[in-house]
């Protein structure tokens, strides 16, 4: 039973939370059903064929040459990895063995290399250990924390946490010994998340975020901390000026205000002032803005208006910042990006001109950009991908969306390459709530605006069906994590298959009411202003109830829709009992093998060989359902 003091409600599947033995028994039963459906959907030979297709697709993405640090006389090599355990692999130039890292930084003392790096205790657990490899030894910090690490003036900066996902204490330590620990800042408010931001010429910032509303601190070269622009609500740190002042963009007062650039003299235009900002470099005079998923590269100047150099669907890759942070060969450093239709590529900006080096990476998809009108009159962007190998019209349609936390839609479509090759169209809907435009766009999708984001998604699906001639019987929708609120609410609205015939879900957030009512869970208090706080009173309880997919389903479940759902047993972001509750509710108290769930032993994401196998199984099952 849910009990908030002022209100109680019955939860028929509460046992999935409290009775571990019963839950584990139910999960084993669901896993057996899932494997039976998977085996019936294709032979072992077909399964292995699709698994190898996924391995080949991801292999094509990991073709980047190792990065040399320093560039001219390298001490270490770094190999960025995509969609594998860890984000990077690194090693000393004379060391045959590569180590994985989630983040790392490099410092040279008298031409001797020091490398600070973080590693997840178990891949996917989100509980990171700080390591420092010195020329003669290795030390490990006793406290775990977040994944980011930075070195500045012989000190290592790291955010500690007492529990995974609750990182709240910025500390610095001696680079050489790991001793002399100093607490730089500790966040006491449980709803605020803090994170390190490394910018140009080793300028270090700390950002605190509370449902999109931000605070910015500058970590000075001496290791002190200074709050910047207390009236600012949104920030984009840039670096440090020639007179050693912090440079940053700020929106003052509210999200509708234009960007102001503090500490530097670039001229801005209205488009930049209103857009989100992904990247900027004072040395290269480059800025990358975003709107409705589209990024624009600008050449910036202190004397003339910004010059538009390039636009398209792409996002800068994390390691693009490295040469700018280190201040090494910044004027010629490439900007690495990835798009939704080709492997990662780079571009170079020099003398207000751009060279896009994408000719060597052949596209695997054709891109079509469009907009849909949401029921409240708001225009919502989308991107449609079709196979570059075939001119035939697509036979089936997959539509994916996320729309939460101000996080940009993932443009990595590697997982969809086998689907495109099989004649599917794959679409991304840039619904409100996400970070595909500016901060106002994200704010429009928070709290009660989440249901408007569902309307955005619905409008995009209908227009994409008209564009592709793929009706509901050939349409599948995909949502992961907080994207589960979108697909779950649409499924509650169309349980008989009138809009789509299939739902594909990974770690879906579908029991918002119960999760948001439990402050003991690691993310609950962070999310009160993103979704709702049912404990606050009847108004927000009703809001959470309306947005919670499990509670908005009709009594008969969803008899007209196939659902494939995956979760991880050790997931602490979206606990696996949410997916189990949802599947049981979708069946409407009847035997129904068109709703299936598999729970593996991993965390919020699946990695390695198991990921390829799961993707292959899902591909065969859904293609069998949507013949």
Predicted feature locations:
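A flexible loop/linker signature enriched in serine peptidases of the S9 family
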Residues: 80-87, 119-129, 143, 159-169, ...
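Conserved blade-register residue in beta-propeller folds
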Residues: 89-90, 132, 172, 218, ...
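Short loop/turn segments that connect beta-strands within beta-propeller blades
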Residues: 93-95, 133-137, 174-178, 220-223, ...
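A conserved hydrophobic secondary-structure block that centers on an alpha-helix together
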Residues: 96-153
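Cap/lid segment of the alpha/beta-hydrolase catalytic domain
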Residues: 104-107, 359-473, 480, 515
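Polar, glycine-rich mid-to-C-terminal structural blocks
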Residues: 175, 179-187, 192-199, 203-206
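Active-site-proximal cap/loop segments of hydrolase catalytic domains
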Residues: 431-627
């Amino acid at each position: 039973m849910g009990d908030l003091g002022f209100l109680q409600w019955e939860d028929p599947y509460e046992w999935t939370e409290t009775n571990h033995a019963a839950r584990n028994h139910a999960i084993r039963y669901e896993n057996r059903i899932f494997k039976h459906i998977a085996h019936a959907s294709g032979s072992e030979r077909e399964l292995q064929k699709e698994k190898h297709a996924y391995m080949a697709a991801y292999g094509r993405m990991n073709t980047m040459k190792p990065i040399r640090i320093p560039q001219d006389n390298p001490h270490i090599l770094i190999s960025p990895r995509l969609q594998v355990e860890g984000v990077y692999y690194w090693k000393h130039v004379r060391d045959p063995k590569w180590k994985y890292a989630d983040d790392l930084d490099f410092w040279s003392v008298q031409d001797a290399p020091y490398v600070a790096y973080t590693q997840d205790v178990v891949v996917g657990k989100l509980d990171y250990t700080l390591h420092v490899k010195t020329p003669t030894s290795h030390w490990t910090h006793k406290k775990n924390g977040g994944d980011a690490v930075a070195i500045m003036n012989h000190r290592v900066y790291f955010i500690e946490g007492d529990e995974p996902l609750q990182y709240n204490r910025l500390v610095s330590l001696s680079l050489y010994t790991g001793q002399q620990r100093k607490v730089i800042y500790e966040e006491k408010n449980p709803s605020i998340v803090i994170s390190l931001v490394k910018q140009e010429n080793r300028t270090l910032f700390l950002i605190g975020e509370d449902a999109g509303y931000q605070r910015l601190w500058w970590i000075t070269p001496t290791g002190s901390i200074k709050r910047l622009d207390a009236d600012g609500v949104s920030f984009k740190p840039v670096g440090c000026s020639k007179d050693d002042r912090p440079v940053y963009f700020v929106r003052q007062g509210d999200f509708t205000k234009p960007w102001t650039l503090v500490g530097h003299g670039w001229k801005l235009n209205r488009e930049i002032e209103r857009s989100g900002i992904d990247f900027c470099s004072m040395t290269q005079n480059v800025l990358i803005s975003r709107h409705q998923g589209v990024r624009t590269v600008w050449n910036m100047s202190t004397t003339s208006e910004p010059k538009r150099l390039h636009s398209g669907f792409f996002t800068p890759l994390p390691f693009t910042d490295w040469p700018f942070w280190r201040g090494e060969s910044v004027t010629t450093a490439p900007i690495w990006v990835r798009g939704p239709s080709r492997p990662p590529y780079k571009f170079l900006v020099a003398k207000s001109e751009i060279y896009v080096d994408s000719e060597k990476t052949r596209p695997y998809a054709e891109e079509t950009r469009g907009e849909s009108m949401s029921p409240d009159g708001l225009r919502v962007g989308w991107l449609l991908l079709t196979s570059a190998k075939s001119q035939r019209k697509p036979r089936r349609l997959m539509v994916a969306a996320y729309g939460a936390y101000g996080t940009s839609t993932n443009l990595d479509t590697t997982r969809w390459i086998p689907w495109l090759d099989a004649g599917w169209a794959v679409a991304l809907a840039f619904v409100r709530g996400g970070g595909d435009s500016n901060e106002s766009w994200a704010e429009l999708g928070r709290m009660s605006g989440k249901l408007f984001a569902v309307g955005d998604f619905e409008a995009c699906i209908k227009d994409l069906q008209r564009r592709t001639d793929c009706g509901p019987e050939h349409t599948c929708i995909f949502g992961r994590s907080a994207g589960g609120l979108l697909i779950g609410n649409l499924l509650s609205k169309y349980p008989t298959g009138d809009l789509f015939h299939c739902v594909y879900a990974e770690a879906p957030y579908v029991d918002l009411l119960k999760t948001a009512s439990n402050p003991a869970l690691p993310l609950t208090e962070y999310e009160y202003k993103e979704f709702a706080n049912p404990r606050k009173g009847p108004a927000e309880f009703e809001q959470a109830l309306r947005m919670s997919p499990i509670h908005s389903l009709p009594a008969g479940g969803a008899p007209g829709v196939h659902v494939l759902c995956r979760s991880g047993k050790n997931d602490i972001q979206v606990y696996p009992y949410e997916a189990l509750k949802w599947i049981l509710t979708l069946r409407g108290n009847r035997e129904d093998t068109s709703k299936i769930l598999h729970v593996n032993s991993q965390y919020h994401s699946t990695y390695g060989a198991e990921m390829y196998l799961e993707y292959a199984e899902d591909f065969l099952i859904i293609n069998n359902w949507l013949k």
